[in-house]
From Swiss-Prot:
NCBIfam families according to UniProt: PRK01143.1
Matches recorded under InterPro entries: Ribosomal_uL11, Ribosomal_uL11_C, Ribosomal_uL11_C_sf, Ribosomal_uL11_CS, Ribosomal_uL11_N, Ribosomal_uL11_N_sf
GO molecular function list: large ribosomal subunit rRNA binding; structural constituent of ribosome
Name by which UniProt lists this protein: Large ribosomal subunit protein uL11
Organism of derivation: Thermococcus onnurineus (strain NA1)
Length: 163
C-alpha cells in the first residue's frame, strides 16, 4: 500500500525545510526532487497556501507522484481581492468587496471539495467564509446577500454561470 504524506505549502515556494523535509526524509525519497516537482505543480498558486499529497508508489524504486489540491476558500478570496489577510475585526472594518461573479468563480473552483449540492449552495459557503474574513459581497453584509440568494435576487447570474 502506498504511503501518503499531506502538507500545506506556499505555491511555487516549497523548500526542503519544515514541513516538507522532515515529512519526506524518512521515506527515502530525494527531497530536492520532490520539492522541485511540488514547485512545478503549484507555480500557478503563487502566494497561496496549497494542499499537496505526496504518494510514495514504490519505496524501493523511490517513485512518487504529487497531487495538488485546490487552495482553501479563504486563500482564493485573498487572491481574488489581492489582499494579504482578512480583517482582524470582521464585521466592523471590511478589507475588501467581492462581486457575485467572483463568488461564483471561487465556488466553481472549490465545488468538488464542498458538501454543497449545487452552485447556489457552494456560493453561500464562499460568502460565509467572506463574512468571517471581513469581506463584503456586492457592497453588502454577506448575511444579507445569502438571504438575497434564497429570495432569487441573483438567479440570472447563477443561470448564466451554469451554462
Amino acid at each position: 500500500m502506498p504511503q501518503v504524506v499531506e502538507v500545506l505549502v506556499e505555491g511555487g515556494k516549497a523548500s526542503p525545510g519544515p514541513p516538507l523535509g522532515p515529512a519526506i526524509g524518512p521515506l527515502g525519497l530525494n527531497v530536492k526532487q520532490v520539492v522541485d516537482e511540488i514547485n512545478k505543480a503549484t507555480k500557478d498558486f503563487e502566494g497561496m497556501q496549497v494542499p499537496v499529497k505526496i504518494i510514495v508508489e514504490d519505496p524501493k524504486k523511490k517513485t512518487f507522484r504529487i497531487e495538488v489540491g485546490v487552495p482553501p476558500v479563504s486563500q482564493l478570496i485573498k487572491k481574488e481581492l489581492g489582499i494579504p489577510k482578512g480583517s482582524s475585526e470582521a464585521g466592523h472594518s471590511p478589507v475588501g468587496n467581492l462581486t457575485m461573479e467572483q463568488v461564483i468563480r471561487i465556488a466553481k473552483a472549490k465545488m468538488d471539495q464542498m458538501l454543497a449540492a449545487d452552485l447556489k449552495a457552494a456560493a453561500k459557503e464562499v460568502i460565509g467564509t467572506a463574512l468571517s474574513m471581513g469581506v463584503t459581497v456586492e457592497g453588502k453584509d454577506p448575511r444579507e446577500v445569502q438571504k438575497e440568494i434564497d429570495e432569487g435576487v441573483y438567479d440570472e447570474i447563477f443561470a448564466n454561470a451554469e451554462e
